[in-house]
Amino acid sequence: MLTWDEEVKPTPRMPQPGVSQGAQGVASAVNRPVPQVLHDGALAPAVATHATAGISAGGPRRVNAADKRIINGQTDVNQLVPFKYKWAWEKYLSSCANHWMPQEVNMTRDIALWKDPNGLTEDERRIIKRNLGFFVTADSLAANNIVLGTYRHITAPECRQFLLRQAFEEAIHTHAYQYIVESLGLDESEIFNAYNEVQSIRDKDEFLIPFIQAIMNPEFKTGTPETDQTLLKSLIVFACLMEGLFFYVGFTQILALGRQNKMTGAAEQYQYILRDESMHCNFGIDLINQLKLENPQLWTAEFKLEIRALFEKAVELEYRYAEDTMPRGVLGLNASMFKGYLRYIANRRATQIGLEPLFPNEENPFPWMSEMIDLKKERNFFETRVIEYQSGGALSWD
């Protein structure tokens, strides 16, 4: 039995013939083979570079910010500073300052309204259940895309830092939807399996999944024009079409309920999620534009046509979802209103990444949604929170 006073002496190891001491150390740390280990595509170039630098210059070369790249970089991804992409770090800090947790939101009024037979119409109840049916698994797909795909291929540590925060926020969002489902006493199997049983939800997920699988493949590596375009396409689909378009029918519907003083606890959580997802979308667009700036050869005429076609398909799928969730007018909304809104959003996302608008002259029929995005966490719009608080970074001992 060891005590704190005893000196711990390492057991000497005999080097194996033909194996370097460093390699033997790595091998000894692995007790058994692990099947299909995901390769961190961003790490390998940095390791190789440092190995070469150590031989030629007598030691590892320190990171120069100017040498950093979004993909295919040769700098050490473990060294966060010096910063090159300060916009990514600033977004990370902003996201941390906006931290929230679902259980902070009081669901008492929502529960009473849901249990009241006359509290909500059947159309309103359908909207809520369809919304939750899509979102409970959508954020899990988004998290999978980040941690099993995108993160491995990004070589800028500032951007990786934001991606880690984003993945955590996706977990919080899934937690929030589960919290709403549990609070209202909904059939969990019905809600959580909706992406297999509700066609309008399944169609959206089937559109997204190939773009996750492409970059999750353990054999996938960037470094060629084709694979770099595959990653760029995946970034565009998730930033502009999933988080930047597929979420907006649901957000609008639930926040419209909140504006009528219905389901205010759920609406407040959706408000925070909307704010988080807006940050994710903006970060993704900045990442896309920086990647394009560093790799202009990827942004070909053919590639742009392919992206435009994906935008058009996404608008079509989200409009079908709007029709399914809202077969009749409710809350002062109807499905046809969303056609203009989705086209307006698609135009905005397209121009943000350097494409021409797909649907000219479309205007925003829901200007109040922009106000929702801009609201700060400290402003309790739906007044369901009993106590406001500051996140850890803003606390003072005074």
Residue ranges of model-derived segments:
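Membrane-interacting alpha-helical segments
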Residues: 40-60, 124-126
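Short, intrinsically disordered, charge-balanced linker/junction segments flanking boundaries
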Residues: 113-121, 357-358
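N-terminal low-complexity, intrinsically disordered patches enriched in charged
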Residues: 14-15, 91, 293
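Short alpha-helix boundary/capping motifs
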Residues: 104-106, 117, 205, 305
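Short, conserved sequence motifs enriched in acidic/basic residues, glycine, and aromatics
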Residues: 80, 119, 153-154
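Non-heme di-metal
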Residues: 123-398
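Amphipathic alpha-helical packing elements
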Residues: 52, 56-114
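N-terminal intrinsically disordered, low-complexity tails
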Residues: 1, 5-47
